[in-house]
Amino acid sequence: MKQLFDPKRNYEETRKLVGYVGRKQATQADYERIGFMSGLEVHQQLNTKLKLFCRCPAGVFQKPEEFDAELIRHMRPTLSELGEYDGTALMEFKTRKEIVYRISNNSACTYDVDDTPPFPLNREALNIAIAISVLSKLKIVGEVHITRKQYLDGSIPTGFQRTAIIGVEGEIQLKNKKVRLIQLSLEEDSCREVSDIGHVRIYRTDRLG
């Protein structure tokens, strides 16, 4: 008789094979042996009056049942500049999700639903990003270029997130050591998810932009 797969047993055997060491049992020598390094990506919403790429007010949040219209979208992947499809984008596309956006007239506009081009970058947000970069000893870039990061989970109606690098190669001084900072970026926020049931995913656009 064929033996049934035992997930717990498989997990324990895999831990032994890779030489897993529990966090509480790990020593400095263990980290040095595997050459362990880790980094953190920290996100912080800025307290600005307006959103990053349009003139809608920031920080105006609606309840799930408070919306003026619904918009339905189906996301499809596109080729990158290298002529390739992003693996994550293809995975999301295969879920065949129907994306529903709940829109409030008080917090969203045609830019947020990808019907008009972006407005000029919010100067208040840019100034805050530059100030943080200076305080963190980051080198300010000579030119700010808006780039795109592809997202097909529906959290951004365009299918990509507009983002810009503001500073690079900085550091924060702690009590006993310095923490190296690779870069600081300024990017638009995504929608807030209301639900994800079956093949329908619902978002609110109040935070978007």
Feature locations, PLM:
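Basic, nucleic-acid-interacting segments
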Residues: 1-209
